[in-house]
Amino acid sequence: MLLLALALGAARAQQTEFLPELDAHLELNDRSRIFLQAKDDREGGDPTQFTFGPSLLLYRKPLLRLKHVLVFDLDSTKSRPVVIETGYRIITAPDAAITNRLIDAVTFHYPLVSGFLMTDRNRADLDWQNRDLTWRYRNKLTVERTVGIHGYHFAPYAAAEPFYESQYGKWASTDLYAGVSLPFLKRVDFEAYYEHENDTGRKPNRQKNYVGVRMQIYFSRLQRAQGKQTAR
């Protein structure tokens, strides 16, 4: 919480934009889930735009050490050592043609000492707008730890994500994050974060700051099926 407060204070001297996001997750079984994402998106130097679309996540059985670290986390995929994602996004922006994006990602979760978790997401975006085709690679490293106060558990985190952009032929942007995940009831998680972006793709270099709020809702067909079996 202190890290997030300091980051927000540092951003006051510069213009700060607000980024809302809503994600709905549906666990299909113990090895897959789908989710639908709707968000204002400025990642990797992108202009003002709205992103919407689904993803499919595939994974194997949870790792016992990860389950112990994440016992209070609503996102069960964090307990899986490897998660594969494939998805599609439609992207709209003012005065611009629609962009279509294909997403492929592999995410690794590593339990660290003292209850810390490190997440390493490797993602490739393939974009096409009219007849123009571009791609980018992004690698997001996140470190988080669940903290409990008077029976309530939340997870502060810090993250860094560099972007390699094909249109510039170089590492063109780096996003830094500080945030906190706040579970609410049994199915909802609110995430508040500060994001600082260093965009070096075009000259002059640009520094941008954002404050984001992400609401994630979790549903599970697996739990529903188990509940019906118990009722019988």
Regions picked out by a protein language model, each given a short descriptive name:
Residues Q14-F18, D30-I34, L70, S76-I84, ...:
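Outer-envelope beta-barrel architecture signal
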Residues M1-Q15, Y218-R232:
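Cleavable N-terminal export/targeting peptides
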Residues A11-A13, D40-G45, T92-A97, D127-D132, ...:
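Outer-membrane beta-barrel domain signature
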Residues T16-F18, D46-F52, I98-L102, L133-Y137, ...:
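Residues that define the transmembrane beta-barrel architecture of outer-membrane proteins
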Residues Q14-V69, D75-P81:
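Start-of-domain marker
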Residues T92-V113, L117-M118:
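Ordered, amphipathic secondary-structure segments that act as subunit-interaction surfaces
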Residues R60-L63, Y110-R202, V211-Q223, T230-R232:
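Outer-membrane beta-barrel transmembrane domain signature
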Residues D23, G53-L57, V69-D73, A105-T107, ...:
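Outer-membrane beta-barrel architecture
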